[in-house]
C-alpha cells in the first residue's frame, strides 16, 4: 500500500473499530441486559407457561406464575434432567405439567418441542420463562417454531458474577442459531 493509503487506513481504522464496539455494546445491552420482559406480577393469562432449561430460579418463577393462575399448563422440556424439574414432572400439581424429552438437549431442541406441543394443543399465547441474558436467543428460536404471542418473564434480575461468561455464551449461541438453525 502506498503511504497516503496507509495514512487513510490508519485514520479510518480507530473510527471503524470504535463504531463496531459501540454497536456491539448497544446490542449486548438491548439483547442480553435489558430485553423486553414482563414482571411476574403483571403477567397476563396465557395458554401455557414454558420454561427453558437452566437454573432453579426459572422453575421457581414458572411455579409462581402457575400458582397465580397465569396458565393451566406448565411445559418443562427435558424436565427430568434436574431435581426440581423431576419433582414437578412426577408429582401431582394443581395444574397440568408436560415434561417432553427433546431430540436435542439445547435451546433449539426445547423451542422445537414447545412449538410442536403448542401447535398440537392449539395454543396461541405462551409465557416463556428464562434468564434475562437468555431471552433474545430463546425467543428468536421459539419464534421460528411457534407463530403465536410470546410474553417473557425472567426470575428477579438474575445477573450475577458469572454474567459476563453467560453473555459470551449467548452471543456464540445466537450466532450459531442463525447459521445452524435458520428454520424450525
Spans of features found by a protein language model:
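Intrinsically disordered/low-complexity terminal segments and short unstructured peptides
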Residues: 1-2, 126
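A structural signal for short, hydrophobic/glycine-enriched beta-strand patches
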Residues: 32-168
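A transmembrane-helix-recognition feature enriched in membrane-embedded lipid enzymes
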Residues: 162-183
Amino acid at each position: 500500500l502506498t503511504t497516503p493509503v496507509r495514512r487513510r487506513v490508519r485514520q479510518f481504522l480507530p473510527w471503524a473499530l470504535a463504531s463496531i464496539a459501540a454497536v456491539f455494546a448497544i446490542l449486548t445491552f438491548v439483547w442480553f441486559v435489558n430485553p423486553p420482559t414482563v414482571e411476574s406480577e403483571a403477567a397476563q393469562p396465557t395458554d401455557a407457561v414454558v420454561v427453558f432449561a437452566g437454573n432453579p430460579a426459572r422453575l421457581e418463577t414458572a411455579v409462581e406464575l402457575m400458582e397465580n393462575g397465569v396458565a393451566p399448563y406448565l411445559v418443562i422440556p427435558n424436565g427430568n434432567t434436574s431435581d426440581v424439574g423431576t419433582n414437578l414432572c412426577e408429582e401431582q400439581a394443581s395444574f397440568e405439567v408436560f415434561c417432553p424429552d427433546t431430540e436435542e438437549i439445547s435451546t433449539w431442541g426445547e423451542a422445537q418441542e414447545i412449538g410442536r406441543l403448542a401447535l398440537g394443543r392449539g395454543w396461541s399465547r405462551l409465557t416463556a420463562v428464562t434468564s434475562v441474558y437468555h431471552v433474545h436467543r430463546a425467543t428468536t428460536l421459539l419464534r421460528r417454531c411457534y407463530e403465536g404471542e410470546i410474553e417473557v418473564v425472567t426470575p428477579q434480575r438474575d445477573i450475577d458474577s458469572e454474567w459476563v461468561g453467560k453473555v459470551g455464551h449467548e452471543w456464540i449461541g445466537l450466532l450459531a442459531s442463525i447459521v445452524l438453525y435458520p428454520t424450525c
